[in-house]
């Protein structure tokens, strides 16, 4: 079975890992970094992902970041020039980039992946993530909750221990708390809670708002109306936030941020850690509630927890660490790299699927309750939140009116008592119910949740055995036909991108060869014949012409011709140098022989010394 890669598809950064032997290993990207910015940019028909895309975010308005915040929103589209992209398509571009460099590292095709999602992602968001994987050419073998994956990374070498751990996962855009029980290789999730719209981006935005407010007060100019200025502020805010994890004050310097009546204006200020804590106090407070809820749902207290694990780059913020310690009564365990733990855990789960990791069982839970709408708009739960998955539950309902020929099944997910306040996952209808008074027909509604947290619902008339089923797919906003079209487009773009990269590489090789040729000709002009020099010059000029005409095939052919001529010339020069060296060596030997007959040569007398003589 081929390798299954583990992908942490993050809001701000993503990472990929693979199991090598018994240990998971992070795969570095082409820039040599262990994480890749979850950023996509479009320019001149070319798509760029990662660090390259992030670097041009200031100057290129067609740059997309933090798309994960919109996963599962069927109405959200990103408009780039004349085309609209869904969150799944943008995410697929990130996944495809990760897939490509994972393949380069492994030296083989990658077609399977375990992808992580926030524990509090609903069905729509999970399905959208799975669709993104499919568009990128990946079969998503398993969707794993991020805190659960981090627990796998933490606990792989502790399979003989019995522990209860609390995973506090604060990433770039989402926040989760999960409580797990580890014992005999079983990783059982007891409860999960969180906020899918809380993360490092929100901390950045607090700094940005503060900078905008102060600059407006000092200069009367609202920087929030200037797109380019806002991007510079975002970069500066992110840097200041990171700096404040290690220092008590961060300097923010943005020259020429705006133009005033008297000329250019500069933003020069400092942000203390105390002020940053004040600005973000409400965000830190928001992290405490899910901790309490997760403990309550698991029926545990702080005293029952053995370890607290921090995951996600935003847990490096000192105020967050202090809040975790104050709320749980435990000093957080920082043995796991917060940026890499999730991807490492996903790779371990990939190893469990392939059979490379044995004696490990992962029991996850559904984060939100599932049910249907019943009479009066009430939400009737069939599966409660924090139920271990996979699971199945059925309940019998009846008709609400006499002679009712059909029932509408409105599938929902959430915790509110009224249907209208919860998330609609899908609707379907069971028809041809025999005529009967209200309350007589027996309609069995059955919910199935698979290991990925994907929901299947069926309704069956127990009197006639007529059944109708629905797999909740449409909630992600994409039909099978749309996904197939996007898969096809992604493959076409992949081929075009590959061709474009090959062209760029070829042009770079040609430039390097032309430079090397001119340099070589200067060095060897007096050492080779005029005919040889001319043949190289002609080949060089032919390559330059092909380069100017952008004729790729001709460039390849002429490059190969010139390369051969340069190599032949280099071999000849090397042989000449070798012959000259040999001749010089022979002359040296002759001189040495002559010197032995010199009348001034003195023969030395040597006396053998007995080692015992001086004892």
From Swiss-Prot:
Induction profile? By stress conditions e.g. heat shock.
Kindly state which keywords UniProt assigns to this record, in alphabetical order: ATP-binding, Chaperone, Nucleotide-binding, Phosphoprotein, Stress response
Q: Which InterPro entries match?
A: ATPase_NBD, Chaperone_DnaK, Heat_shock_70_CS, HSP70_C_sf, HSP70_peptide-bd_sf, Hsp_70_fam
UniProt biased composition (Basic and acidic residues): 604-615
Query: For the modification Phosphothreonine, which residues carry it?
Result: 174
Q: Name one GO molecular function term.
A: ATP-dependent protein folding chaperone
Compositional bias (Low complexity) spans?
A: 575-599
The ranges of region (Disordered) come to: 575-615
Tell whether Hydrolase is among the UniProt keywords.
Answer: no
Family classification: Belongs to the heat shock protein 70 family.
Protein task: Acts as a chaperone.
PANTHER family, per the entry? HEAT SHOCK PROTEIN 70KDA
Xref: HAMAP family: DnaK (MF_00332)
The protein depicted here goes by the name Chaperone protein DnaK
Source organism of the structure:
Ligilactobacillus salivarius (strain UCC118)
Please name the taxonomic classification of the source.
Bacteria, Bacillati, Bacillota, Bacilli, Lactobacillales
The gene that this protein is the product of is dnaK
